[in-house]
Amino acid sequence: MSASLAILTIGIVPMQEVLPLLTEYIDEDNISHHSLLGKLSREEVMAEYAPEAGEDTILTLLNDNQLAHVSRRKVERDLQGVVEVLDNQGYDVILLMSTANISSMTARNTIFLEPSRILPPLVSSIVEDHQVGVIVPVEEMLPVQAQKWQILQKSPVFSLGNPIHDSEQKIIDAGKELLAKGADVIMLDCLGFHQRHRDLLQKQLDVPVLLSNVLIARLAAELLV
């Protein structure tokens, strides 16, 4: 029987960019995508997941192509419920595709991949003592990103570049800003960044560029071979 993969997302993720990374190894018919908020309107999302005063939040992309702050507690609660359903359905691997710092969910039977738990040590082992620069889509994500990459030998440097709303030149300028700050490896840790952004930056800046969704997708694919 062919291996099966369930991709779980919080909001909107460009699956057309992710699937080619996986279909080299697994038939597309054996891949399913499940989004917690992706099919809901902004009004429906905020009615169910609006954060209470002082509550920890997650920043996610909704189907109006705009970001929203939602309650971490409510999202993690309902994501765990979806994981349990998928686990009971017999998937071989469940892949959570999110750059949010979520690492508290469990699955009883299937392999469950949480990027926030797996990627930081993986990237740290790849870059060793090189200076990493991270392009962050919005300023609000800077504290979360700084916390996420604490494991690196050298504290990362940051610049702002939004893959959804900014031009290619703005993304290149964000990369140049990182080089000026001493970076010799660039990290794109946002699901809006695609292979074309990585290729663009590598060509223009001549430094290695790591793309988080490529790293986690390839890891998932290896587990399915």
From Swiss-Prot:
One annotated GO molecular function: racemase and epimerase activity, acting on amino acids and derivatives
Pfam families in the record: AroM
Function recorded in the entry: This protein of unknown function is encoded by a gene that cotranscribes with the aroL gene, which codes for shikimate kinase II.
NCBIfam families: PRK10481.1
Protein name stated in the entry: Protein AroM
Organism of provenance: Escherichia coli (strain K12)
Lineage of origin: Bacteria, Pseudomonadati, Pseudomonadota, Gammaproteobacteria, Enterobacterales
Gene this protein is translated from: aroM
